[in-house]
Amino acid sequence: MNDRISEVSGSSRARRSVLSYGTTETGSDRYTENSNIATENGVDTASSMIDGIQSGFPQPRHGFEEEYNNAEYINMLEQVFYMYYTDKRHRGVISKKNAEPTETIHDWRMRERLKTVSAALLVCLNIGVDPPDVIKPNPAAKYECWIDPFSLPASKALEAIGKNLQQQYETLSMRTRYRHYLDPAIEEVKKLCIGQRRNAKEERILFHYNGHGVPMPTASGEIWVFNKNYTQYIPVSLYDLQSWLGAPCIYVYDCSAAGNIIVNFNRFAEQRDKEALRIAKQNPNVLAMPSHTSCIQLAACGPKETLPMNPDLPADLFTSCLTSPIEISVRWYVLQNPFPNKLNLNMLLKIPGRLQDRRTPLGELNWIFTAITDTIAWNVFPKHLFRRLFRQDLMVAALFRNFLLAERIMLVHSCHPQSSPELPPTHDHPMWNSWDLAIDNCLSQLPDMLDAESKGIAYEYKHSTFFSEQLTAFEVWLSQGLISRKPPDQLPLVLQVLLSQVHRLRALILLSKFLDLGVWAVDLALSIGIFPYVLKLLQSPAIELKPVLVFIWARILAVDDSCQADLLKDNGYGYFVQILNPNSSIFPSSNISEHRAMCAFILSVFCRGFPQGQLACLNPQVLSHCLSHLNSPDSLLRQWACLCISQLWENYSEAKWSGTRDNAHVKLAEIIVDSVPEVRASVLTAFTTFLGFPEKTEEVVAVETYIAIAALAALSDASPLVRHELVIFLSHFVVNYKKQLMVVAYESSLADILEKKNHNSISASTIYETVWQAVLVLAADPSIEISLAAEAIINYVYQSMLNSELRESFLAFLLQHLPALHKASLSKDTDTNSVTSDPKPHPFVPSVSENKILNRSFSLTRSLKGLALSLAGSDRASELLSLNGENKPAESNLNHLTSAKVPGPPAFNELEYQSELDMPLTSYLFDWSRKYFTEPQMRPNEDDEPGSICYNQRLWRRNRNEKLIYRTRPLAEYSTNGRWNQQLMTFNNTIAPRKLMFHQFEDQLITLGDKDIIQVWDWRRNRCLNSFKTSASATTNVTDMQLLNEDDVALLMTGSSDGTIKLYRDYENEKVELVTSWNSLSDLVFGDRNASLLMSWQQNCGHLLVAGDVRVIRIWDASKEICYANLPVRSSNSITSLTSDLVGCNIIVAGFSDGVLRVYDKRLPARDSLTDVWKEHSSEIVNVEMQSSGMRELISASSDGEVKLWDIRMNHSLQTFSTDNSGLTSLTVHSHAPVYATGSSNQSIKIWDTLGQNINTFRENPRFLNQPKPSSLMCLKFHPHHLLLACGDNTDSRVNLYSCTKNEIHTDSPNEF
């Protein structure tokens, strides 16, 4: 049992199997160490390095061989490989559309729940007199309600039959009021029916008709009763019957030719409904009458059929099936059984026990019968019909369960029971075999049970294994690989098993596994009726049920939050409050933190938009419990503790005051720098809901100011998810302090327009000034959804300003400076080559970069100009603009720009998103986060299952990668004596390249050209795969690019001169998408297109090193999306080149503009990270590069043509070579071969080995004799594995590809690669 508990109470996060992606604390994906296809580590496998060392090759430099001989270190590198930027938060913008559930559930609650409150039981037997149209054989069926009518006097027999009929119906529903009318006259029938409708009001009436003693119904459907003297049969028109009984009703017809009644009843019902509709149209004030076509009817046989007269069966076989299914089932089973046994028909009515007691033989049979008929109906009937007939009314459900039995039994006797609504056939369903087996198990013990009972001896009854076997079948279905969305046959049985304490835990565990399959599974479970069961179980004190019940409730509330009132009733929510309590120890699961996270989620849904829920959660200290979990090691618990607090605070001042007393805002501020982006975003959501006290007392202002200051720490966050929540928080802060922000915006706008360097204002250095400047920073955010949201805040403030007392002065000022505004706008719209050389600083606090404000100055100016044009009047505005002759559209000056597309986030519609930007902005983080509980957590994703398409693709890529490395590794020794001037092909790039890069394993060459155009080439087929523009900005340019996750599906990372980092998915095709973006170096000088941002990506540890014209090397942690460290460069010169150890990821080497090389170790504290300074170069460092495998050579080159080899353990270079290049412009080093290449401004390319020997010299673009040789900046790049070299320069758009050829090794065909 404990094993079963742990099975469910295990991690609610994704459990990954072999090859699967796992989820780390920080959210990045990884291949697990058990993976059979664990991929390459970064650029090369550690095993290949070890093989090289053990094969007698020279030892790697820098002392790395010590690490390679460490088995634990090598295992770590080979067995764990992380994938970055593949989490759910990187799959799209969190907008209203994206936060909506991808699947919806049906309305599983019965909104129009009817009850059968009254029943009229008409029995027309006329015992002793056969009707004229019936010829009975001898012997014939005679039992009515299990009574022989000829064993008693006629009057007593009739009375006994009526009494038994009522008792049989009472086993179906005790709450229904029954009246039986025996051999009634027509007057009595009329009076009975009218009285029944009057008493039932609008509820359902049961009308049971036994016509065994009267003629068959007429062709028009009339049924027969008696006159007062019992001398005549009197017909009753169905039209009259409908008038007397009204609707809704359920009719049971037990007579021959009963199908005629249904046919004619429906015909009259349609006529009545049409007439009612006509009257309603003529007089809308008339109350609508219930529809007669919705009445339910059950008939014993078809229109031309006669009831069976088998003497071994009761005469009212149909009634027996409907009201005493167990008795008739066992009798029919014995009659159908050809084998000899000890049973006789009299024994069958003596099965011990009670129907309501499941522990007795009779009760167990009844329980099994209910489960089987429910299962058959669920699997055969349409779902809407199942809900109407089996979940709306106890009486209707019981009758239809038993009707399935009637169909099975009576078909054998040439009767076809009819119903309205018509049902699909179920007589041959396989589950009937299980019913026969259950009967056989009981009857096989019946003689011994009766014998023991007669002797007064206790008998140990062997219970049926039906339910345990069905649970096993359900478990097998769940354990299969690909889960079909076809519901399992056993699902209704699971609900029945919940009634049993013996099987309850197992059933709950299996149910939780089923719900884990997704929204569709929860929808099925709710529609079948799971909710009342799990709601009632919240009252159970059983400790072993707590983990699984928490999981089930989390799944239900993740898709349907309409259960709040249900949880409030009977204190159901207290079940989860008790588990959430950190001092609670009554929990059997070892991973209680994850179940507490689910409890926090459940309570957050309970509070959301439900004031009664908020009030209920305030008293049992839910807030205190959540605060105590903010420092939990489980990130999911931290996240949902914050979100639960946010929902408790939403529009509930008392809860906010309670949080203030508990220092909730201080505790939340402490985790604003949490390692998980979702947690940081959740903190900001909680801050947002805290704002909005109705009264702004000093204490309230102080607390909200504290929160605003704490929230601004997220301004430099690398996760768009966090920054998006920040801009939402700021929108609420702006709305709450609108007057103060209007003053700040007014003064800031004047300063911006007048370009005042020192603008004194009453709001300077206040929190409102800081907030306003933060909004301006966010308006320049590289993520479009954030910048649009920030612009909405700016527009809101300006519109509020123009609707306030500042309107006149501000409008007059705008009109006065409108021409200047328009000129500034045009100049910034059209100037694509330069920006203002002396940008005016914006008044700002030290905590926010001024350059970010300047980056947004154009948008601010444009906004002000737009406001002025719209408010000042078109005539005056046109006049002012015409004075300057600048009313031509700005787009005419942009024709020279390329029309290449700029990728955005996946499925992002800017217009649709802007329509959602109402102030204050709405956060959809909660809805987005709750989707976690709709995704499978107990089993790997389908893509990670062996045999799936994605699995096979990943396996193929792994094999391809290993094969490529295995095939290219031996070529390294031939690289130093081959011919490198063999030109394989030329790529006709559309624009001159500035940087080149090969994919390690795909046949891709990526070029970065002017105007930030990136082109992706298939170098084997000389085909351009895709071309796109990384930015529409004319003031920055992309200066570096890297590839991430190359072993699987790579992402392309670009870095711009303004510090912006962008990542792209599917960059090789037209569906390229922006994954994420952020500003990595906010201190870079804005507008300096010569500024360079340099990057070094360390795949093994997920660190991105960023440097440029700043005084630090900033290290970003990709998994946490935060700044890991800032290493001081200890130099006033700019960094011109950056490299690092891509295996151990600890050593960083930077080259500077003054020729100095500096070595850093990021394992050391930041202030002590500088370990070596090499000053041997006398001119600017062009490039410094460390091999990722092979000898791990570290090579640097300066612009004067000097190349040096280094070992980080030495304080001087190992070797120095002079390339004799006049104006060396580029250096590239092969990843594992002992060669490097240099390029000069005269387009001369030289290939060298690491001993300083020149292998080849050739020119990139040969010219004719008298043609001048322009100076150019060359770009070179080796393929990481193949012996290929790509070359380009900034005077020609062509890119040439060269290979190292040697007759013994290669042919001249590129297919060799």
Swiss-Prot record:
Belongs to the WD repeat RAPTOR family. WD repeats lie at residues 986-1029, 1033-1074, 1087-1126, 1130-1170, 1176-1216, 1219-1259, 1268-1308. The modification Phosphoserine is found at S834, S837, S882. Residues 1-35 are annotated as: Disordered. GO terms for biological process: cellular response to amino acid stimulus; cellular response to starvation; meiotic cell cycle; positive regulation of cell growth; positive regulation of conjugation with cellular fusion; regulation of autophagy; sporulation resulting in formation of a cellular spore; TOR signaling. Component of TORC1, which regulates multiple cellular processes to control cell growth in response to environmental signals. Tor2 is essential for growth. Nutrient limitation and environmental stress signals cause inactivation of TORC1. Active TORC1 positively controls cell growth and ribosome biogenesis by regulating ribosomal protein gene expression. TORC1 negatively controls G1 cell-cycle arrest, sexual development and amino acid uptake. Pfam families: Raptor_N (PF14538), WD40 (PF00400). It is found in: Cytoplasm. Signal peptide: none annotated. One of its GO terms (cellular component) is TORC1 complex. This is Target of rapamycin complex 1 subunit mip1. One of its GO terms (molecular function) is protein-macromolecule adaptor activity. InterPro entries: ARM-like, ARM-type_fold, Raptor, Raptor_N, WD40/YVTN_repeat-like_dom_sf, WD40_repeat_CS, WD40_repeat_dom_sf, WD40_rpt. The target of rapamycin complex 1 (TORC1) is composed of at least mip1, pop3/wat1, tco89, toc1 and tor2. Keywords: Cytoplasm, Meiosis, Phosphoprotein, Repeat, Sporulation, WD repeat. It comes from Schizosaccharomyces pombe (strain 972 / ATCC 24843).
